[in-house]
Amino acid sequence: MAPPSLPCGIYAPTMTFFHPESEDIDIPTIKHHAQRLAKAGLAGLVVMGSNGEAVHCTRDEKIAVLSATREALDAAGFQSVPVLFGATEGSVRGTIELCKLAAAAGAAAALVLPPSYYRAQTDEASIEAYFVAVADASPIPLVLYNYPGAVSGIDMDSDLLIRLAQHKNIVGTKFTCGNTGKLTRVALATDAKTPFRDGSGYMAFGGMCDFTLQTLVSGGSGIIAGGANVMPKLCVKVWDSYSQGNRDEAEKLQKVLSRGDWPLTKAAIAGTKSAIQTYYGYGGYPRRPLKRLEQARVSAIEEGIREAMEIEKTL
């Protein structure tokens, strides 16, 4: 039986919050953040992705964050909001083990990068074999994660993604590559789910909120975007406006969203946490070796997203 389809819409790859001095995981803040995002109307959450500092966390910490997020959503009445889990490890065996742990902790699907540490020995055939082996054994479906910047430049093309989509336990791709042409080809070939029709249920996710509208036009299913940690309601408004036929409003708001997302993109994890701290009173810092931002940079981010946040406050 095919796995249940994920809902269309905006997903946030949530931050992992740490105590500022000890760098221990801050579970109460993680739970608070998950509930705030769900209340803002997000379709789903992703934990232990790139924004979640997965590479800075142990396996036990990863599962603790997943469990806390699922518990927080359930406690607040958001049992239907799915949580995806970044389950990438370097080996087939390790990734399968992590998928099994994630399933037991309540993950709806696993977000998985291609293997990349041994880049010189990693070709397309080995990448395809890796995903097939993991998908064969994982108790939860896979969403493939195409993010060349995180995997030594490996950029899976549409032909490979379309072939992998034929596996019954591979249910989507996140296109952090930003290639809307590739997203369009994959969405078309897989009959991807959209706000207008269920199609096959395959999910073609844009990977940044600055091309939310472009993803919709391309036949996409949703957005998994770091900016949704900061301006979730604006992200949802762009998505809903287009989906409900108000294209002019969607275009207008997308321009604001694209401008506001850029300062966050440039400042990455530290910048997003800084913006959350400025506007919501929590956030803190990344784990080392990522640097803490100087006050001048914090102020610049605050100013850079001001227009977007003024709209966010009205929604």
Swiss-Prot record:
Record-marked site positions (Involved in proton transfer during cleavage): Y145
Keyword field: Carbohydrate metabolism, Lyase
PANTHER family: DIHYDRODIPICOLINATE SYNTHASE, DIHYDRODIPICOLINATE SYNTHETASE FAMILY PROTEIN (AFU_ORTHOLOGUE AFUA_3G11920)
Function comment: Mediates the conversion of 2-dehydro-3-deoxy-L-galactonate to pyruvate and L-glyceraldehyde in D-galacturonate catabolic process.
Superkingdom field: Eukaryota
Protein name, per record: L-threo-3-deoxy-hexylosonate aldolase
GO MF annotations, alphabetized: 4-hydroxy-tetrahydrodipicolinate synthase activity; aldehyde-lyase activity
GO biological process, one term: D-galacturonate catabolic process
